[in-house]
Amino acid sequence: MVLNEQLSNMYQPYFNELIVHLKSDGLVDKVQPSFLLGLNREKEGKVSIGDETWYTQADLKVMIFGKEVHEWGWPKLENGTQLGSDDLVEAYEVFYSENYRDTFFLTDGNSKLSKSPFFRTGFNGLMDGINERLKKVYPGKRAAFLWNEISKLSTMEGRSRKVDDPMIHQCELDYFHVIPQEIELLKPDVVIFLTGFGEPYDRYINENFHIQSTSSVGNISMDDVVKLELEEVPLAYKTHHPGTTTVAGHGLNDAERWNHYNAFLDDIDANFDKIQGLQ
């Protein structure tokens, strides 16, 4: 069984249970669809017969977390067909097939989401920084990057669930707590949280990962960058969301943001020897 099939099969019972409770609790019209990952990239014009080797055969696997999804929306199905988890997996795969280009994320296409600061500044910047460092040390090796969200459910407006409706978060905890299974199946070597600091996102990280310790990186304040020792992955870091423009009452400009990024990118570089796929 290929990895993408394992991932899809894992989602199915969780999603079915989640939908039952979202409907019974009167929440289904308040939320965007649960955020599911998929590995198939388009092949012969179809993601259904797509290729997952871009990820499975990568030497370095990086997962980048945002806060919660915006601009996602429920897929439109024909003939009143009931929405299934595979439809949401395919929605992710179509988005990735249209915008992911191995060494950069397309930000001038038709998707409004791909033009967001998360992809334009954060995702693209980190892809470029990691690929540049990897090429210098291991010129024959290749990295793959997956987008994820630490909040698998968000309101229709895409805002924090803590502000809008804590019942939605409880539904995720009770019926769609899938991030640990995603990590177990996908086995990322590096996890980067572009979630910022404080509630509710620090709590969401703690709900999904076992944090052994935290430490500073270089000379950067732990209010801006934190290295996380996680039980689940070799390397993990947390910093501000790319859309953040003010921190502790002062502006966060591009130069400061790149000081933060370069600090943990250099730390990743210094720890490439911890990555099994690079040895």
What does each model-found stretch correspond to?
Residues 2-186, 190, 196:
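A polyanion-binding, active-site-adjacent surface
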